[in-house]
């Protein structure tokens, strides 16, 4: 008696259930990439959930620190990098502001709409500004997969950028930058 299924190299039909074809499984990253981006080479997909993920389709196997080569369709690979604090960093920022507002006013309500407005204001105030004058937020609050001991940081604080808008925009930029550096 066989306890584990046979390993296969492609999606195969296994049978049907309620008149639907049942196939071999693929990983969640592979399934989301296929559904969102298809199977074109050099296509890049960014997912932002609790963590963040950047995936690119390649016909060549490749590994680097922090990058996994995951099998995909027809002998291709998804090169995937993942951050531990993707959307979690934004949720942490919202919680920070919500706790401040509750302390100041006694009211507690979600502030994501306010953060969205502040992000736009932050982008407008940062556009064209030199990097050394922009608030830099590293959103590695829970470390990284390669360096779990790493922590987040805020640098380049000045009287010009010590604003809620700069913090919101800087957090979003930090979330994006962490994934971009993997690419």
Residue ranges of each PLM-predicted region?
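Active-site core segments that coordinate phosphate-bearing ligands/cofactors
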Residues: 8, 14-183
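Active-site gating loop/helix substructures
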Residues: 1-2
């Amino acid at each position: 008696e066989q306890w584990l299924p046979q390993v296969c190299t492609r999606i195969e039909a296994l049978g049907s259930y309620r008149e639907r074809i049942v196939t071999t499984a693929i990983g969640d990253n592979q399934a989301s990439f296929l559904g969102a981006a298809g199977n074109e080479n050099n296509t890049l997909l960014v997912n932002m959930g609790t963590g963040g993920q950047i995936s690119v389709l390649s016909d060549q196997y490749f590994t680097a620190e922090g990058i996994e080569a995951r099998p995909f369709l027809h002998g291709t690979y998804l090169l995937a990098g993942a951050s531990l604090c993707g959307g979690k960093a934004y949720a942490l920022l919202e919680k920070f502001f919500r706790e401040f507002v509750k302390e100041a006013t006694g009211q507690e309500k979600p502030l994501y709409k306010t953060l969205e407005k502040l992000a736009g204001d932050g982008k407008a105030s940062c556009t064209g500004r030199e990097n050394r004058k922009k608030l830099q937020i590293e959103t590695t609050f829970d470390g990284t997969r390669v360096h779990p001991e790493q922590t987040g940081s805020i640098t380049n604080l000045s009287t010009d950028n010590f604003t809620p808008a700069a913090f919101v925009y800087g957090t979003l930029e930090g979330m994006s930058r962490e994934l971009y550096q993997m690419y």
